[in-house]
């Protein structure tokens, strides 16, 4: 089972960019954020106003996303030897669910916690601070709550006594180097 490096954080804080660059550097696979995929699929629906950026997610949507995220992580982890890079995971989805539904739902955390087959103890979380410019890509709508989300991640990591690192440089090159340093420290 590979060591898993999970990049989490608010919107437009560089997670996906880091995941892509690190998967190339380490010649490994990376798990995409399924919540993002689901949002893109919702906006493809002709009954949704794509200009409104209102996804109208439900708890059932998040439960389905959690199972899909776990499945993707599991399938890709079977194809990696040493390292798997993840753009969010089901633990992170608990906070995204709270962000969109305005309430914490333990059902999502339970899906994360009960996924023994994912070997969650083998994960290193890397939280990206939202101190880089917000980039609107047509799907994002949370610029005003990036600090809140960052604080929620810290609170949840603390609550569950989880190991995590923070990438806080506003410089993208330094952020990448910090991520590499974290990975190197944890794969030796």
Question: How would you name each of these model-derived features?
Answer:
Residues 101-176:
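A glycine- and Lys/Arg-enriched "phosphate-lid" helix/loop adjacent to the NTP-binding pocket
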Residues 7:
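Hydrophobic anchor at the beta1->P-loop junction of P-loop NTPases
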Residues 15:
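Conserved lysine of the Walker
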Residues 61-119:
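Glycine-rich phosphate-binding loop used to anchor ATP phosphates in small-molecule kinases
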Residues 2-4, 81:
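Pre-Walker A (Motif I) flank of P-loop NTPase domains
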Residues 20, 24-68:
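Conserved substrate/cofactor phosphate-moiety recognition/catalytic segment
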Residues 11:
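The conserved Walker
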